[in-house]
């Protein structure tokens, strides 16, 4: 089974990076490179993503033990990483200490949207081409 999990926020603007949760010596990583070409490993430090544990792609092998799974995330870059982190922080603060329907909420939602979905038609074209 092949699975592509779409993400936005990290990496160069409009570039789509295929990211494996497995290392270069793992069968799933090798199948991914056979199927899709240039796959980067978060485990080996090759990708725009930090190495994560507990991600759902990694859990698939346990959930479906009799299925050969080849899973990657496809991460499209939007804005610089500091802007992404600031948007995530603003959203977390709003939900932990603010009012999701209060006067600050629309600005925070706009900040999060700007960090994860560029409205520029050229960005959409780059994402669609990938």
Regions found by a protein language model. Name each.
Residues 1-130:
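C-terminal accessory segments enriched in acidic
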């Amino acid at each position: 089974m092949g699975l592509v999990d779409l993400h936005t926020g990290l990496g160069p603007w409009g570039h789509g990076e295929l990211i494996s949760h497995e290392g270069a010596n793992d069968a799933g990583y090798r199948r991914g490179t056979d199927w899709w070409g240039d796959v980067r490993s978060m485990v080996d430090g090759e990708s725009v993503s930090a190495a994560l544990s507990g991600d759902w792609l990694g859990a698939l092998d346990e959930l479906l033990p009799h299925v050969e799974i080849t899973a990657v995330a496809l991460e499209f870059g939007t804005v610089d990483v500091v802007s992404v982190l600031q948007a995530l922080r603003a959203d977390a603060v709003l939900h932990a200490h603010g009012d999701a329907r209060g006067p600050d909420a629309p600005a925070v939602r706009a900040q999060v949207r700007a960090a994860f979905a560029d409205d520029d038609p050229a960005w959409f074209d780059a994402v669609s081409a990938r």
